[in-house]
């Protein structure tokens, strides 16, 4: 809650809303109040530190709601984040050490394993307006990436979701 990416989009959130929501979804007495307070106060600082001192960058997920958005303090979106996509070839040979994304977070068809972001996934899997154009763009870019196909087989150089997060952490360690 209250991270820099949501604030950049002028999202209405507060520490009290976050506290109310956490308390509404947690079994009473199972999480110490001091841990909740630490999460609320220090979580945004951790995100700021990573943003300012590493290659770890996120994007706000405006349409990804809390699990129970109707609970006290719940929100219809803007609390979740995902790592910014990154070109995996920046990892050099370490790209080969990175596991494929989970099949539920990529378009998998035979040997093809094409990555997408959560926002793209919502559009594609929901067959929302524009999904065909997006799919054609992603698929064409993926298939025509001949250097990648020749060196790494069907691995997608465009890393998203967890793989993007891991890649950004690895690159930060190398800096």
Predicted regions and their residues:
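Conserved N-terminal/central alpha/beta ligand/cofactor-binding core
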Residues: 1-175
């Amino acid at each position: 809650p209250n991270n820099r990416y949501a604030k950049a989009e002028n999202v209405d959130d507060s520490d009290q809303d976050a506290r109310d929501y956490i308390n509404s979804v947690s079994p009473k007495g199972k999480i110490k109040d001091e841990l909740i307070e630490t999460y609320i106060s220090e979580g945004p600082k951790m995100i700021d530190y990573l943003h300012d001192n590493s290659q770890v960058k996120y994007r706000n997920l405006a349409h990804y709601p809390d699990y129970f958005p109707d609970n006290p303090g719940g929100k219809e979106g803007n609390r979740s984040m995902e790592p910014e996509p990154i070109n995996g070839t920046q990892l050099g040979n370490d790209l080969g050490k990175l596991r494929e994304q989970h099949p539920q977070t990529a378009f998998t068809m035979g040997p093809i394993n094409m990555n997408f972001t959560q926002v793209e996934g919502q559009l594609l899997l929901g067959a929302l307006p524009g999904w065909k154009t997006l799919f054609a763009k992603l698929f064409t870019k993926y298939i025509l990436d001949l250097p990648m196909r020749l060196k790494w087989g069907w691995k997608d150089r465009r890393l998203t979701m967890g793989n993007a997060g891991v890649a950004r952490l690895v690159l930060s360690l190398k800096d």
